[in-house]
C-alpha cells in the first residue's frame, strides 16, 4: 500500500475523545465512508492484495467489518460471511465466547456459512484490531467450520494493545494503518 493512500486514510478518520467511555480515543471510520473516491481507493488496494490468493469468502466481524468486508467481497467476486453478536443470526449457528475487560461475550457464525464446503480459503476483516478478543474468537469459528484463514485484515491496528501480537501468533495479520 502506498504511503499517500495511508496518509489520506489517516486524515479521513475522525478521532472522538472519551467515547464510548472516558479514556478511550475512538477511531470513527464513518468520516472515511463519506468520501467515495477514497473508500474506492481503499477497497481497490485491498482487492489488489487478495486477488491472486484464490480467496473463496470474506468473513466480516460485526459491525464495521460488514462494511469493509461486503465491499471487498463484491470487488473480488466472492461470498461474504458475517460474524455477529450472539442471538443476531436467524439459522443454526456455532458460538464462541471471548473475554472482555470485565466479563465475557459471544459471537456466532451460521453453521452453513461456507455452504458445507471444507477447506475454503477466507480473509477475516474488521476496521480495528485492539485487544484481539473478537478476532481470535472469529478464527476459532472459522476453524470449527474447517475453513482456512489466509489472513486477518484490519484497517487499523492499535500498537499499544496486545491484539496485533496475539493474532500474529495464530494467523498472518495485516493492519493497513498502525495507530
Curated annotation (Swiss-Prot):
<keyword id="KW-0808">Transferase</keyword>
<dbReference type="GO" id="GO:0044209">
    <property type="term" value="P:AMP salvage"/>
</dbReference>
<comment type="subunit">
    <text>Homodimer.</text>
</comment>
<dbReference type="GO" id="GO:0005737">
    <property type="term" value="C:cytoplasm"/>
</dbReference>
<dbReference type="InterPro" id="IPR005764">
    <property type="entry name" value="Ade_phspho_trans"/>
</dbReference>
<dbReference type="GO" id="GO:0016208">
    <property type="term" value="F:AMP binding"/>
</dbReference>
<keyword id="KW-0963">Cytoplasm</keyword>
<keyword id="KW-0660">Purine salvage</keyword>
<comment type="function">
    <text>Catalyzes a salvage reaction resulting in the formation of AMP, that is energically less costly than de novo synthesis.</text>
</comment>
<dbReference type="GO" id="GO:0006166">
    <property type="term" value="P:purine ribonucleoside salvage"/>
</dbReference>
<dbReference type="GO" id="GO:0003999">
    <property type="term" value="F:adenine phosphoribosyltransferase activity"/>
</dbReference>
<dbReference type="InterPro" id="IPR050054">
    <property type="entry name" value="UPRTase/APRTase"/>
</dbReference>
<keyword id="KW-0328">Glycosyltransferase</keyword>
<comment type="similarity">
    <text>Belongs to the purine/pyrimidine phosphoribosyltransferase family.</text>
</comment>
<dbReference type="InterPro" id="IPR000836">
    <property type="entry name" value="PRibTrfase_dom"/>
</dbReference>
<dbReference type="GO" id="GO:0006168">
    <property type="term" value="P:adenine salvage"/>
</dbReference>
<dbReference type="InterPro" id="IPR029057">
    <property type="entry name" value="PRTase-like"/>
</dbReference>
<comment type="pathway">
    <text>Purine metabolism; AMP biosynthesis via salvage pathway; AMP from adenine: step 1/1.</text>
</comment>
<dbReference type="Pfam" id="PF00156">
    <property type="entry name" value="Pribosyltran"/>
</dbReference>
<dbReference type="GO" id="GO:0002055">
    <property type="term" value="F:adenine binding"/>
</dbReference>
<protein>
    <recommendedName>
        <fullName>Adenine phosphoribosyltransferase</fullName>
        <ecNumber>2.4.2.7</ecNumber>
    </recommendedName>
</protein>
